[in-house]
From Swiss-Prot:
Keyword Thylakoid (UniProt): no
Name of protein: Ribonuclease HII
E.C. number(s) listed in UniProt: 3.1.26.4
Cysteine disulfide partners in this protein: none
Reaction(s) this enzyme catalyzes, per UniProt: Endonucleolytic cleavage to 5'-phosphomonoester
Family: Belongs to the RNase HII family.
Role of this protein: Endonuclease that specifically degrades the RNA of RNA-DNA hybrids.
Species: Pseudomonas syringae pv. tomato (strain ATCC BAA-871 / DC3000)
Phylogenetic lineage: Bacteria, Pseudomonadati, Pseudomonadota, Gammaproteobacteria, Pseudomonadales
Domain of life: Bacteria
Keywords noted in UniProt: Cytoplasm, Endonuclease, Hydrolase, Manganese, Metal-binding, Nuclease
Listed GO CC annotations: cytoplasm; ribonuclease H2 complex
């Protein structure tokens, strides 16, 4: 169920929930849920995107050491392609909350909608900049996913995954067109689908139409 609450009145056993990886063309969407310990404040919490990599790595360890409990979850590429990215994200958030070793009294979700949970929940727009527990969740999710992207770069070299983290940068799009999609690319995303169809046409001996400017008499 979802409730509209005055967040300033909520103190103990509030879980913050956030995700990383909705926009990339490859890799899982990663989520985290965190219940902070009011007796062990963590200085410097903020939206993970506003922190340096070194600061995120430091806070990643501190959050895991000081939080009452935390859990990192995910939805795989196959689930993203089957469900769509929104529903896969909601599923991953649900898994994160359900994975907590302590049942929260309330789950505050970054964004404008909540997954279906067995505990009260409420969305908080830009919550990773407003709610410490959501900021903590954003850090756990981002550091986890960034580390995974660095590891996948070793398995799938040539795409620059460690740098762009799977987002549709010019470098990534060029590599995708040149090399074709890997098993970790999301086939339901337009640029990946286009690259996949182009590679399939080549494998079948078909031809890919050239832009008009490249055609010669």
């Amino acid at each position: 169920m979802q409730t509209g609450l005055d967040f300033t009145l909520v103190e103990d056993l509030v879980a913050g929930v956030d995700e990383v990886g909705r926009g990339p063309l490859c890799g899982a969407v990663v989520t985290a849920a965190v219940i902070l310990d009011p007796a062990k404040p963590i200085l410097g919490l903020n939206d993970s995107k506003k922190l340096t990599e070194a600061k995120r790595e430091k806070l990643f360890v501190e959050i895991q050491e000081k939080a009452l409990c935390w859990f990192i979850a995910r939805a795989e590429v196959e689930e993203i392609d089957q469900l769509n990215i929104l529903h896969a994200t909601m599923l991953a958030m649900k898994r994160a909350v359900e994975g907590l070793s302590i049942t929260p009294k309330l789950a505050l979700i970054d964004g404008n909608r909540c997954p279906q949970l067995s505990v009260p929940s409420a969305p908080v727009v830009k919550g990773d900049s407003k709610v410490p527990a959501i900021a903590a969740a954003s850090i756990l999710a981002k550091v986890s996913r960034d580390r995974e992207m660095a590891a996948l770069e070793l398995i799938y070299p040539g795409y620059g995954i460690a740098g762009h983290k799977g987002y549709p940068t010019p470098v990534h799009l060029e590599a995708l067109a040149r090399l074709g999609p890997t098993p970790i690319h999301r086939r339901s995303f337009g640029p990946v689908r286009t690259a996949h169809e182009a590679r399939a046409a080549i494998m079948l001996g078909g031809s890919i139409p050239l832009p008009v400017g490249l055609l010669q008499d």
